[in-house]
Structures are given as structure tokens and as C-alpha cells.
Amino acid sequence: MVLLTAIPQGFLDDLPEEDQQAIREILGKRVLLNEYDDAGRAELEFRDHEGTLHYLYVAPEFIITAY
């Protein structure tokens, strides 16, 4: 489990409002780190308040280990 510590600048710009809100809601909360992709980005998995499953890819500097 990791914490998303910040949202990369411009990351939300082209996303639907409901996806933007879901990502804002997990900021600073524990989410599942699935793996790192070939580009070195962390694949995060989480469910929003409605139970919708989301995946997002961020550079490692935007996450920390959750204890």
C-alpha cells in the first residue's frame, strides 16, 4: 500500500469530472500499488465512493510507502 502525496501538474486536465474527483479524494490516502510499468510509472488501483474501480499511473516521486 502507498499514499498518493501529490497530483502531477496537468494530470487531471483532460479527465472527466467524476474521475478528477475520485483522484482528488485519494490524495493522502492508502491505495494499492499493483506494479511499475515499462516506463517506471507506478500503477495504482482504488475504488471511489461509488465502488467504481480506477487505475492510474504516476511517477514514483508522487507516492510514498503507507505504514
Language-model-detected regions and their locations in the chain:
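Basic/aromatic-rich interaction segments and small domains that mediate binding to polyanionic partners
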Residues: M1-Y67
